[in-house]
């Protein structure tokens, strides 16, 4: 059983503020953190300043948020990205064991983020959590549209995969489009 540091949003925000990230990357990291904080506060029925992250507060999740923010900021500056289209997010089913016990999938924080951020969840029969609260918060933080253009040119493709193994391929595919 691993023990992760329990940090509040102010401590995590201070880590981002003290970093060498660009202003744009810091703004993105703060947006992601704010979305996570709101979702966790609602899930636990507490005020924002009473939220203490368990999994999210772990160093690896802070690094995930910062790394995404840095890469997204660089992408936006390099390619003059105007919009981020998030059509839907694919989620699994069943339950997951976490710091708070056994929770249904999607976990309450993901449900809260999807509802508040206008994210469409495509529910599948894949047993397991395909969308983490951090992943949902990232999508909600950068989403500006939810529909692809009728026609467009694909300029580049990016693929990413997690560590978990499921019965179906689980990866994120991102397109850089020019319409």
PLM features per residue range, with description:
Residues 1-44, 107-110, 114-136, 149-154:
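Glycine-rich nucleotide/cofactor/substrate-binding loop typically near the N-terminus or early
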Residues 50, 57, 135:
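Long, contiguous binding/interaction regions
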Residues 39, 47-49, 101:
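Glycine-rich, flexible loop/turn motifs
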Residues 40, 71-72, 139:
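Broad structural signal for hydrophobic residues in well-ordered alpha-helices, predominantly aliphatic
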Residues 77-178:
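Mobile "lid/hinge" segments at catalytic clefts and subdomain interfaces of large enzymes
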Residues 31, 54, 87:
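Solvent-exposed loop/linker segments at secondary-structure transitions
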Residues 45-50, 62:
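Non-catalytic, charge-rich alpha-helical accessory subdomains
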């Amino acid at each position: 059983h691993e023990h992760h540091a329990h940090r509040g949003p102010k401590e995590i925000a201070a880590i981002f503020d003290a970093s060498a990230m660009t202003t744009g990357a810091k703004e993105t990291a703060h947006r992601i953190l704010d979305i996570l904080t709101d979702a966790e506060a609602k899930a636990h029925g507490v005020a924002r300043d009473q939220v203490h992250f368990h999994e999210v507060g772990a160093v690896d999740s802070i690094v995930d948020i910062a790394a995404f923010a840095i890469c997204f900021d660089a992408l936006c500056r390099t390619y003059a990205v105007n919009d981020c289209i998030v059509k839907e997010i694919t989620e699994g089913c069943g339950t997951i064991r976490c710091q708070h016990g056994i929770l249904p999938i999607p976990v309450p924080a993901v449900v809260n983020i999807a509802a508040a951020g206008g994210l469409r969840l495509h529910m599948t029969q894949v047993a397991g959590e395909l969308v983490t609260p951090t992943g949902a918060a990232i999508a909600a933080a950068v989403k500006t549209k939810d529909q692809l253009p009728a026609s467009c040119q694909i300029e580049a493709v990016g693929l990413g995969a997690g560590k978990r193994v499921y019965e179906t391929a689980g990866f994120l595919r991102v397109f850089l489009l020019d319409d």
